[in-house]
Amino acid sequence: MPLNLPDKLPAIELLKEENIFVIDNSRATQQDIRPLRIVILNLMPLKITTETDLVRLLSNTPLQVEISFMKIKSHTSKNTPIEHMKTFYTDFDKMREDRYDGMIITGAPVEQMEFEEVNYWDEITEIFDWARTHVTSTLYICWAAQAGLYHHYGIPKYALDKKMFGIFKHRTLLPLHPIFRGFDDEFYVPHSRHTEVRKEDILKVPELTLLSESDDSGVYMVVARGGREFFVTGHSEYSPLTLDTEYRRDVSKGLPIEIPRNYYVNDDPDKGPLVRWRGHANLLFSNWLNYFVYQETPYNIEDIR
């Protein structure tokens, strides 16, 4: 089944060019099934890029998925046209009475600040709490994973000596967990962050289960509440050139940045990236949608509690 997206969302045409099947609302209303309702709280600066990355992965499923985009009132995006935000994004205040089968909360470029110093901290923690009673399963990504673990479970974050930047090998700790259906024993994930959460802190909290880690990049995936919360520290959703764009941006600004590890062919930026995380990324999102959203959500969406 295709994704059901808002009419005229830029991602529609971009993904059609990649031969990915998507439909707009007008076509979806002719299909007599209840689609899964997924809300995305997109905190990344380049909204359209992140929308496209996530929608690309959510399309890899036999389920019809209806996507909505949430925004917070206490922060104004400086890198996305105002008209785009007005057209496709809705304030949390206007969505708080709604319920959703799944939610994705993205990373944000605020990780080097203390959580409480982030200007939208009060609002986003209200959203974290709201999701527990209005969403069947929530997927927290990168900074959102750190923030969610801190808010719900008191897990601290720690500054790294240098940026964790590149593609890193990971292993599953519970290979029979449904989120890992189809995974290889080892798989690769992009990371781009200045902070981390640590294994020893996760293991102290009985409500948390560590699912995956890396010798190089540490904690990768944590689950709580029987799959109603997933915390993922990497960026499986990244497109092939995202790390390249970040690297060249920082070089042009004269910032201290190393070549992303295990990313370019022969570590040569001129040769482009070697993509080895695409298969894992598609499995991660399709398994989450199937086993923790579709299989768990009630048919009557108002029954979500």
From Swiss-Prot:
Cysteine pairings via disulfide bonds: none
Cell compartment(s), UniProt: Cytoplasm
Cited Pfam families: HTS (PF04204)
Entry EC no(s): 2.3.1.31
GO cellular component terms given for this protein: cytoplasm
Function in brief: Transfers an acetyl group from acetyl-CoA to L-homoserine, forming acetyl-L-homoserine.
Residue numbers annotated as active site: C142 (acyl-thioester intermediate), H235 (proton acceptor), E237
Chain's gene name: metAA
Family named by the database record: Belongs to the MetA family.
One GO term of the biological process aspect: L-methionine biosynthetic process from homoserine via O-succinyl-L-homoserine and cystathionine
Domain of life according to the entry: Bacteria
Record's protein name: Homoserine O-acetyltransferase
UniProt KW keywords: Acyltransferase, Amino-acid biosynthesis, Cytoplasm, Methionine biosynthesis, Transferase
